[in-house]
Amino acid sequence: GGSTFLQRPRFLALSEFGPRSLVYHEGRAYRVVRVRIAPSGHDAMADGSQLPSRSVRICAVCGAAHFDQHSNACHACGVALADAQTISALYRIENVDTEPAERITANDEERQRQAFELQTTFQWNMRNGVPDVRTVGAADAEGDVLRLHYGSGATITRINKGLRRRRDQSVFGFWVNP
């Protein structure tokens, strides 16, 4: 059969549209079979190079994302990024192709279900080279109880690091063969 186009909110699609995942739409089951490479990705690969990707460092203390590899300290909490987790070759997947799945039992579905390791990160917007963040605190007689940081223009990024049960937990993502 042919492929079927399904649309999902991006945050949901990240966990639903992983390789070989089952997706339910209008009472039918579909299996993710391939990634649709954006036209800009095809252009970049025309000369035999790789998909256009980015790297990120994630602060071990607060979870802030640093796509700018030049900073030595976290833009959110100020901690040195020496212990930050680095994830290389991030590629933003816009669409996937699915095919109708064969009928399967609930037991087969549970056996085939794939759990992905997802991580949510953030980046504060910068204004004049300074994070555009408002901070509010609450304290009692013993000191700080709560400190809240709010950035109206923060960028939230969700990363699918791969299967939770992958063999090597230090290797992230999936192979893409366009």
Residue spans of the language-model regions?
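Charged, low-complexity interaction segments
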Residues: 1, 14, 53, 57-61, ...
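Accessory interdomain/linker segments of ATP-dependent helicases and helicase-like nucleic-acid enzymes
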Residues: 1-21, 29-32
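Generic detector of short alpha-helix boundary/capping microenvironments
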Residues: 8, 47-50, 139-142
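Hydrophobic beta-strand core residues of beta-sandwich domains
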Residues: 17, 66-67
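Short, Lys/Arg- and Gly-enriched loop/turn segments at beta-strand edges
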Residues: 29-42
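Inter-lobe coupling/hinge segments of SF2-like helicase ATPases
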Residues: 39-40, 44-60, 67-68
